[in-house]
Amino acid sequence: MDIKAYFELIRLKNCLTASFGAFIGGLIASYFNLATVYDLILASIVVFLVCGFGNALNDIYDLKIDKINKPERPIPSKRLSLTDARVFSYLLVFVGLFISLFNMACFLMAVLNSIVLQQYASTYKKNKIIGNLIVAYLTGSVFIFGGIAVGNIDVTIMLFLCALFAMWSREIIKDYEDIEGDIQEKVISIPIKCGEKSVYIAAFLLVFAVFLSPLPYLFGFFGIYYMLSVVFCDLLFLIGIYNLVKNPSKKEAKKASRNIKIVTNLVLIAFLIGSLFK
């Protein structure tokens, strides 16, 4: 058994990042109540397994394309058979859903996200207009999942919304950067439909995320330390997207995409600061 191939199939780093997001989301929602750690560990394991299921499905459905573009991937390289990959993916989701029964609300969300992952892999990868929103939703949903695990989703809903709109913006920018390849692959995307105007759509979504970011302070969940931290992040967001709008080149799109990814992580730190120093 090639264990490394299984880790590659599920994209181990992505799974660890997602599970860490759920754990951090729960810590924020519980204001670092250590009594919730056991539930957060279970929630993180569920996210890891369901994320692995989704990533494995992507490789299963992308087999034809990967034979040409990524022949080193576990299935096209024959380090894993298609049958083994299928069995493993459904084992992951079965175990993940079983563990999620520790909390019925977590179970229902895990079922929902598993269905969304299956639909994305089978139907919406080539329709990025819908696919981008799905990716953004899945990215942000890990924070809500952590909040559900500890019984408080108020703050994590706001974190979810900020992450959703920031990641949605980033996905459109990435598509703008990859427009030629997507045309060859007959993919539907906002940049293919709208051209340079898609940069303005991405900018609008990111500005909306910035607009939402003060809500935890305004609603009294967090104090001034959060506000100061998130204003710094918002300025970085706005500078990056302004540079792209001013110069909508592929080079600037790459910079803007990287900037959003980095600053979104800084926003997560701002939420941590807000939770710690309320």
Swiss-Prot record:
Principal localisation: membrane
Pfam families documented for this protein: UbiA
Reactions this protein catalyses: sn-3-O-(geranylgeranyl)glycerol 1-phosphate + (2E,6E,10E)-geranylgeranyl diphosphate = 2,3-bis-O-(geranylgeranyl)-sn-glycerol 1-phosphate + diphosphate
Names of the cofactor(s): Mg(2+)
Statement: the UniProt record of this protein carries the keyword Magnesium: yes
Subcellular location: Cell membrane
InterPro entries: DGGGP_synth, Prenyltransferase_related, UbiA_prenyltransferase, UbiA_sf
Keywords assigned: Cell membrane, Lipid biosynthesis, Lipid metabolism, Magnesium, Membrane, Phospholipid biosynthesis, Phospholipid metabolism, Transferase, Transmembrane, Transmembrane helix
GO term, biological process aspect, one: glycerophospholipid biosynthetic process
Signal peptide as annotated in the record: none
PANTHER family noted in UniProt: CHLOROPHYLL SYNTHASE (PTHR42723), CHLOROPHYLL SYNTHASE, CHLOROPLASTIC (PTHR42723:SF1)
Function: Prenyltransferase that catalyzes the transfer of the geranylgeranyl moiety of geranylgeranyl diphosphate (GGPP) to the C2 hydroxyl of (S)-3-O-geranylgeranylglyceryl phosphate (GGGP). This reaction is the second ether-bond-formation step in the biosynthesis of archaeal membrane lipids.
Family: Belongs to the UbiA prenyltransferase family. DGGGP synthase subfamily.
Protein name as catalogued: Digeranylgeranylglyceryl phosphate synthase
